């Protein structure tokens, strides 16, 4: 019996489970079952969670939708003509469809946040060193410079908080040396927050419905008493160049 006792939790395909495939969309990994559990899988079992399914991803988990040559395409349960996002799009679709009360995805550049936005659910993209990804199947084996993180996906903020506290209270730093030994802390939110809004990233112009949604959000935040400032993306290209230099083979783009 633990804090997650009896709770069904779905897992993104890259979480290795002994005896099961973790293809992450590669046909070359079909029928090559794992011979051990990912560390988080063992932790969830000790906390009482019930694992019952793994969910779809794009090949190598590197695009913002979920389609591959093993399981096909995952679509949005709210509108099957739209994507459920990626790379944790199998999780977002299942949770939005109420097929899973809580799921675990992973994220480097938006793989939790994009699917959650596409399907209207909640997620947390934590800092590195909080939730262990030890023993997971990588889509970019050997790439250690920019680390993936994992986080919960659910239909309420209370679910996200409950899961996060349970994992941190389980002291993951005792089983994964990359985890930071920082206990759970209750923090009172400030009544007034300063929030930045990105109207345009300097690369892709948002469509009118996205801009309208941003304006509506800004109006509601201001009415709630928060300070909203515009975010200038002028340094984003520099950050992207740095990312390419440390993440990709030879630090180069090849076209």
Range-by-range predicted roles:
Residues 65, 71, 91-192, 196, ...:
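Fold-level recognition of mixed alpha/beta catalytic cores in primary-metabolism enzymes, strongest
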Residues 21-22, 62-66, 113-118, 135-137, ...:
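Short acidic, glycine/serine/threonine-rich loops at helix termini
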Residues 59-61, 111-112, 205, 238:
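Generic structural signal for helix capping and beta-alpha/helix-loop junctions
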Residues 1-109, 224:
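Gly/Ser-rich catalytic/binding loops embedded in alpha/beta enzyme cores
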Residues 37, 121, 211-215:
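Amphipathic alpha-helical segments in well-structured domains
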Residues 1, 166-255:
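Amidase signature
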Residues 74-88, 128-138, 252-255:
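Short, basic, helix/turn surface patches
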């Amino acid at each position: 019996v633990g804090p997650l006792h009896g709770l069904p939790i779905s897992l993104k395909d890259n979480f290795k489970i002994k005896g099961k495939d973790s293809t992450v969309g590669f046909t070359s990994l079909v029928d090559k079952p794992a011979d051990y559990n990912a560390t988080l899988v063992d932790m969830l079992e000790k906390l009482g969670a019930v694992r019952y399914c793994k969910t779809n991803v794009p090949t190598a988990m590197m695009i913002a939708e979920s389609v591959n040559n093993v399981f096909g395409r995952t679509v949005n349960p709210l509108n099957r003509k739209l994507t459920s996002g990626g790379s944790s799009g199998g999780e977002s679709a299942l949770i939005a469809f109420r097929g899973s009360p809580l799921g675990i995805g992973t994220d480097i550049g938006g793989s939790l946040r994009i699917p959650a936005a596409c399907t209207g659910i909640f997620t947390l993209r934590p800092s590195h060193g909080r939730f262990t990804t030890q023993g997971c199947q990588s889509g970019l084996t050997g790439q250690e410079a920019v680390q993936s993180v994992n986080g919960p996906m659910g239909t309420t903020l209370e679910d996200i908080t409950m899961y996060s506290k349970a994992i941190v209270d389980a002291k993951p730093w005792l089983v994964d040396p990359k985890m930071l030994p920082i206990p759970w802390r209750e923090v009172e939110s400030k009544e007034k927050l300063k929030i930045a809004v990105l109207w345009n990233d300097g690369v892709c112009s948002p469509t009118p419905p996205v801009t309208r949604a941003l304006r509506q959000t800004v109006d509601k935040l201001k009415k709630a008493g928060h300070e909203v400032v515009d975010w200038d993306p002028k340094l984003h290209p520099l950050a992207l160049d740095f990312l390419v230099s440390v993440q990709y083979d030879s630090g180069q783009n090849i076209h």
